[in-house]
Regions:
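Active-site-proximal cap/lid insertion segments
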Residues: 1-98, 111-119, 174-185, 196
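C-terminal cap/loop subdomain of S1 sulfatases and analogous C-terminal strand-loop tails that border
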Residues: 57-63, 89, 102-105, 110-190, ...
């Protein structure tokens, strides 16, 4: 992939190659997870093992004209996550309940039957594993920076089951010092606009 242009359009053939590479990666990971599960079964450990698989971000495959991972759009912020516990939930449950990656640790504590330290900010989502309609939080928060007018701005993005609202503020993202006003806001309704085309 060393021939990707730093600026400008990516050719149709290169786009196909990038999408193929992404799908090959997903297929490879699926195969590796299958091997892990088979080995746990072979060793007699599958009924005593909690499995968590997650990514720290999604990935743009040309949507919004982007081929990157870092944005506040749904495709980048929506991280893949699988949790399996032999004692909790039904197989193949899917939920659209808003959760955050900081919910993983308290969930593991809950599933393992140990107390979650009081200073932990996340919330256990073990009840979502049993009932996919259960909610542990109203919305999930994400943030990411970008350049605007030669200055770095921070985007704070709040996502519930229906909407995403992102507010862009001029600030020094390292110190947290705000040095400007809100420069833009975005609001997307996923029921009528699942691809974030209408702001």
């Amino acid at each position: 992939y060393s021939d990707i242009p730093l600026n400008g359009n990516i050719t149709t053939n290169k786009q196909k190659e990038l999408i193929h590479g992404y799908k090959a990666c997903v297929s490879y990971i699926d195969s590796q997870v299958g091997k892990l599960l088979s080995k746990l079964e072979e060793l007699g450990l599958s009924e005593n093992t909690i499995i968590v698989l997650w990514g720290d971000h999604g990935w743009h495959l040309g949507d919004h004209g982007l081929w990157i991972k870092h944005t506040n759009f749904e495709q980048a912020v929506n991280s893949p996550m699988i949790i399996y516990s032999p004692d909790h939930g039904l197989e193949n449950n899917k939920s659209n309940s808003p959760v955050e990656l900081l919910d993983i640790y308290p969930t593991l504590c809950d599933l393992a039957g140990i107390d979650t330290p009081s200073e932990v900010q996340g919330k256990s989502i073990s009840q979502v594993m049993v009932d996919p309609t259960h909610k542990v939080r109203q919305a999930a928060l994400a943030q990411y920076t970008r350049m605007s007018g030669g200055k770095r701005v921070m985007g704070y993005s709040l996502r519930d089951e229906k909407y995403r609202y992102t507010k862009w503020i001029q600030m020094d993202y390292k110190s947290g010092e705000r040095y400007g006003n809100t420069i833009a806001c975005e609001l997307y309704d996923y029921e009528i606009d699942p691809y974030e085309k209408i702001n």
